Amino acid sequence: MIPGEILTEPGQIELNVGRPTLTIAVVNEGDRPIQVGSHYHFAEANNALVFDRELATGYRLNIPAGNAVRFEPGMRRTVELVAVGGERRIFGFQGKVMGALK
């Protein structure tokens, strides 16, 4: 074994199996690139991103942990979101939830 090496079982690793997902269109109407990380509550992302925030409440990007999606100015992109897991409580970000999701 090499120091720092990670050994995994053979086959593909499936992420977020069985969790609700949704696909939404997002447009960056700002003048600067915006990056959103894998575990950021998507409904509270930068206000220059235009999308259905009510629909996205309780969801995050369906991408591997530690990754991010970049939205260039004027760019329209479709992203897949996945429901937040665990106790489904959200704190911080823009402070719009601050507790349990409904």
Swiss-Prot record:
Keywords: Cytoplasm, Hydrolase. Pfam families: Urease_beta (PF00699). It is found in: Cytoplasm. GO terms for cellular component: urease complex. GO terms for molecular function: urease activity. The keyword Cytoplasm applies. CDD domains: Urease_beta. It catalyses: urea + 2 H2O + H(+) = hydrogencarbonate + 2 NH4(+). SUPFAM superfamilies: Urease, beta-subunit (SSF51278). It is an enzyme of class 3 (hydrolase). Pathway: Nitrogen metabolism; urea degradation; CO(2) and NH(3) from urea (urease route): step 1/1. NCBIfam families: PRK13203.1, urease_beta. Heterotrimer of UreA (gamma), UreB (beta) and UreC (alpha) subunits. Three heterotrimers associate to form the active enzyme. PANTHER family: UREASE. Belongs to the urease beta subunit family. This is Urease subunit beta. It comes from Bordetella bronchiseptica (strain ATCC BAA-588 / NCTC 13252 / RB50) (Alcaligenes bronchisepticus). The gene is ureB.
